[in-house]
């Protein structure tokens, strides 16, 4: 029974890692092998993905949803923002570092020769040097747990050989096995202050995900805008071509009338100048379309591959909205925005991290009060002559027999008289929380304005479509009337050409109103945090 106390102490020490392991283990997805994906480790950037799925008859045939999906898959800006999420995950992995176990070992050999200065050195004479050789072998293990408990265990052995005849054992081996734990009781003691960096790091990951969601929403809005810009540019080109065709038809009739003598020679220049002017508009519209398509290719990632960059785009969406036009009031839209905008989630996570930092700073103001307990088992072994008999002992048998124990208990107190570093840390945390509170208020103000503007733009677009359709109908009737009067000799070519110009302007205005409505719908979705909903997409699929 004389070994019961040491064995109990060792049992408790050995059980400590098992008792604390569930708390100190990383959560799923917080391990390096989970985070270091092949994409992260690759030193090359993958080419555009998924473009081949939309290749039809030598063209890229794209719906609006297709364009959004390709943007999220291939757009460089989206991938750069996604990298911020990955970076925050590795920062979380680094927050586990204080709890990593450490195993160290040491092997050292030293030999010395020195002249004797005393007969007690046992060399047998003044002309015989003192020769000694020491070999040291050590193994140490240490680990800190989320309770703040630091556990250390070590095993060391020293092999000493010296030409001293007074030594009982020569060579002799001294071995020690030691166990020690240190538990902070105030500052950095127990779970909260040690888990706080992990909590903050996890909040930062969640905040980066919310920020990425906001960037995805912005990228979707940009992709939608560029998609409809191509549709509008293509529609504008069609309007310009129809206007040119009408002017050329009028010019041909006037030229025929001039040949027959039914038109004064000077009147032909008006219709001829209109043909030239409208041809300029067609050229301008063609190059505006090219620029819009190049911008859309950049958004889709098609510019990254020369083959796909050279393909024509075939956009399947029509600007004229089908079905009932969307309606939403400002109050409902604002309520949705406050609940679903990812920017608010990012601010909430930042404020949560601020609260944790403040609590941690208060803990750092406490004095250091540490409880330390240690146990060591010593052993001495070697070969020597005792009472004229050859004797051999084992130091390892002695240390594991626990015959020569050493017990240590210590309570240490460190009381800073000012502790300015901790006070500065607390002040910084308080200022950070105040800054984030103002950020939340500023965000709420900006979102309120964004929602109001988006709803107003939607209502304006709906009214513009109705007015544009009426204006186009009247412009067509006016063109037909002026053309009929001119054919009957009651009108002038000036009025006919002016009516054609007004009709083209009405067509252009209606097209702009229709595209404006589509953009306004996308703007409402963006303002209310619903940008992903129309396309059945989730941000989690991009940040796994």
Predicted regions and their residues:
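Acidic, low-complexity, intrinsically disordered peripheral segments
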Residues: 4, 19-33, 113, 294-311, ...
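Bacterial N-terminal signal peptides
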Residues: 9-18
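Regulatory alphaC helix of protein kinase catalytic domains
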Residues: 44-70
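Small/polar, glycine/serine/threonine/aspartate-rich low-complexity segments that form flexible
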Residues: 55-59, 107-179, 183, 315-326, ...
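A glycine-/polar-enriched beta->alpha junction
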Residues: 70-79, 86-101, 138-171, 180-197, ...
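Amphipathic alpha-helical coiled-coil segments
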Residues: 80-95, 215-240, 249, 256, ...
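Periplasmic alpha-helical coiled-coil/stalk elements that build and connect Gram-negative outer-membrane
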Residues: 95, 209-333, 457, 502-503, ...
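Amphipathic alpha-helical coiled-coil scaffold segments and their short linker/junction regions
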Residues: 263, 267-268, 302-373, 377-378, ...
């Amino acid at each position: 029974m004389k070994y019961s106390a040491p064995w109990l102490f060792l049992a408790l020490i050995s059980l400590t890692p098992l008792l604390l392991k569930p708390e100190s283990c990383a959560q799923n997805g917080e391990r390096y092998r989970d985070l270091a994906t092949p994409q992260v480790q690759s030193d090359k950037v993958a080419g555009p993905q998924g473009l081949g799925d939309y290749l039809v008859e030598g063209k890229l045939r794209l719906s609006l949803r297709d364009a959004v999906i390709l943007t999220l898959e291939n757009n460089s800006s989206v991938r750069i923002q996604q990298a911020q999420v990955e970076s925050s995950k590795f920062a979380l992995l680094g927050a586990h570092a204080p709890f990593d176990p450490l195993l160290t070992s040491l092997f050292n050999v030293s030999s010395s020769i020195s002249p004797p200065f005393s007969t007690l050195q046992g060399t047998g004479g003044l002309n015989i040097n003192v020769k000694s050789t020491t070999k040291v072998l050590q193994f140490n293990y240490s680990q800190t747990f989320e309770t703040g408990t630091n556990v250390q265990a070590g095993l060391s052995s020293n092999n000493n050989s010296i030409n001293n005849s007074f030594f009982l054992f020569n060579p002799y081996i001294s071995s020690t096995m030691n166990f020690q734990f240190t538990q902070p009781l105030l500052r950095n003691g127990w779970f909260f202050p040690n888990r706080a960096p992990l909590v903050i790091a996890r909040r930062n990951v969640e905040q980066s995900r919310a920020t990425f969601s906001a960037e995805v929403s912005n990228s979707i809005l940009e992709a939608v805008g560029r998609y409809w810009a191509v549709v509008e540019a293509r529609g504008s080109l069609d309007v310009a071509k129809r206007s040119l065709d009408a002017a050329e038809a009028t010019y041909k009739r006037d030229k025929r009338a001039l040949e027959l003598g039914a038109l004064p020679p000077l009147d032909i220049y008006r219709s001829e100048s209109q043909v030239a002017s409208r041809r300029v508009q067609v050229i301008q519209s063609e190059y505006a379309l090219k620029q819009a398509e190049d911008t859309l290719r950049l958004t889709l990632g098609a510019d990254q591959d020369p083959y796909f960059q050279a393909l024509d785009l075939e956009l399947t969406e029509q600007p004229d909205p089908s079905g009932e036009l969307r309606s939403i009031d400002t109050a409902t839209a604002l309520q949705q925005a406050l609940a679903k905008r990812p920017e608010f989630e990012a601010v909430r996570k930042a404020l949560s991290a601020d609260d944790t930092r403040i609590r941690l700073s208060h803990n750092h103001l406490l004095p250091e009060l540490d409880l330390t307990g240690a146990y060591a088992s010593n052993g001495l072994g070697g070969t020597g002559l005792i009472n004229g008999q050859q004797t051999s002992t084992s130091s390892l048998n002695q240390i594991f027999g626990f015959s020569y124990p050493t017990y240590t208990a210590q309570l240490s107190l460190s009381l800073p008289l000012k502790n300015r570093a901790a006070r500065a840390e607390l002040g910084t945390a308080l200022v950070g929380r105040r800054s984030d509170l103002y950020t939340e208020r500023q965000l709420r103000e900006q979102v309120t304005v964004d929602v109001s503007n988006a709803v107003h733009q939607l209502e304006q677009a709906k009214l513009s479509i109705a007015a544009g359709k009426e204006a186009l109908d009247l412009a067509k009737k006016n063109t037909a009337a002026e053309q009929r009067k001119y054919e009957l000799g009651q009108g002038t070519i000036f009025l006919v050409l002016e009516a054609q110009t007004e009709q083209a302007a009405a067509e252009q205005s209606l097209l702009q109103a229709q595209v404006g409505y589509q953009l306004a719908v996308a703007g409402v979705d963006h303002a209310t945090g619903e940008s992903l909903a129309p396309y059945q997409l989730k941000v989690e699929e991009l940040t796994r």
